[in-house]
Every structure is written in structure tokens, then in C-alpha cells.
Amino acid sequence: MIQPQSHLNVADNSGARELMCIRIIGASNRRYAHIGDIIVAVIKEALPNTPLERSEVIRAVIVRTCKELKRDNGMIIRYDDNAAVVIDQEGNPKGTRVFGAIARELRQLNFTKIVSLAPEVL
């Protein structure tokens, strides 16, 4: 469960290292975001000499959360960290690689480009 002011790791090579959620895209008073939700975030930490800079406002899709994700078949998935992938306005990832495992639910939410870049889909 990601809410405003939550810090997330970045799971791609876009140049950002850490994000802070400032808004959840969707309903106007939505409190929490889960895997597959799009958030508006600010870059808190970035690598030098990359297109993304610190304090830049971007969009990202959440790919891992510490909060459990319960599937219809009864399986429960939980990750060690909260992580997101930086995307552009069309929903395409800004990076060319995705690090770590991501959830299978992203494929059903039409983030197929992110799923194809991921090394492992759980």
C-alpha cells in the first residue's frame, strides 16, 4: 500500500534511484495505491549525467509492494521492497531495462512492455 509521502525504489535504468509518491492517479480522493497503479512522484535521488534530475516530477507504475497481494487462486505474493518503474505519458517505460521480479498482474493491466523487459515475472 503506497500513499502520498511514501518512498519507493526505482526498478529500471532510467537514472532515478528513489522516488516519493505525491499523488495517486485515479479517483480524486484515493488513499492507497497497489501493484499496477500509476502514481505521480518526485525524484528524491538520481544518478549523475542522466536525463532525469533530482526534484523532477514524473509518473511511475508500481511493480512491487511490501503489502501482500492476494490472487484469485489463494496465492499470496509479498516483496521485500516498494518499487516502481518510471513511465512517460503514454505508459511506456523510460528505461531500457527492468531489475528484479514483477507481478503477473501488470500484463493484464496493459503494461506489456514492462513485462517483456523484466527478468522474472511472478
From Swiss-Prot:
Cellular compartment(s): Plastid, Chloroplast
CDD domains in the cross-refs: Ribosomal_uL14
The keyword Ribonucleoprotein is assigned to this record: yes
Record keywords, A-Z: Chloroplast, Plastid, Ribonucleoprotein, Ribosomal protein, RNA-binding, rRNA-binding
PROSITE patterns the UniProt entry points to: RIBOSOMAL_L14
Gene Ontology BP annotations: translation
Pfam families the UniProt entry points to: Ribosomal_L14
Assigned GO CC terms: chloroplast; cytosolic large ribosomal subunit
Recorded GO MF terms: large ribosomal subunit rRNA binding; structural constituent of ribosome
Main localization (coarse): plastid
InterPro entries according to UniProt: Ribosomal_uL14, Ribosomal_uL14_bac-type, Ribosomal_uL14_CS, Ribosomal_uL14_sf
Functional note: Binds to 23S rRNA.
Sequence similarity: Belongs to the universal ribosomal protein uL14 family.
Subunit structure: Part of the 50S ribosomal subunit.
Name recorded for this polypeptide: Large ribosomal subunit protein uL14c
Species this protein is from: Eucalyptus globulus subsp. globulus (Tasmanian blue gum)
